[in-house]
Amino acid sequence: MKEANTRRYIHLCLVVVLVSTIITTEAEDDRLFCIRHHKYCGHRPNRCCSGLFCRCNTFGTNCRCQSKGALGKLISGK
């Protein structure tokens, strides 16, 4: 009985660590794992760092994280 409780406790601890790691990773995702300015973003267009967005050429290629232009800033209010 004591051995079974110990296994359950260890299992519960592992689950708590895993869940907290996932939550922390999602929270830090924007800062640590974002795509920086002028870097390629075609494979993950929503991963540009804060204040940037993925902009591609007319043919949908050569996508790069760039800041919004003056008109884009005016429209979004940021």
UniProtKB/Swiss-Prot annotation:
Signal peptide from the UniProt entry: 1-27
Chief location category: secreted
Keywords recorded for this protein, A-Z: Amidation, Disulfide bond, Ion channel impairing toxin, Knottin, Neurotoxin, Potassium channel impairing toxin, Secreted, Signal, Toxin, Voltage-gated potassium channel impairing toxin, Voltage-gated sodium channel impairing toxin
Pfam short name (any one): Toxin_9
GO terms under cellular component: extracellular region
Cystine bridges: C34-C49, C41-C54, C48-C65, C56-C63
Family: Belongs to the xibalbin-13 family.
Protein name (record): Xibalbin-13 1
Species: Xibalbanus tulumensis
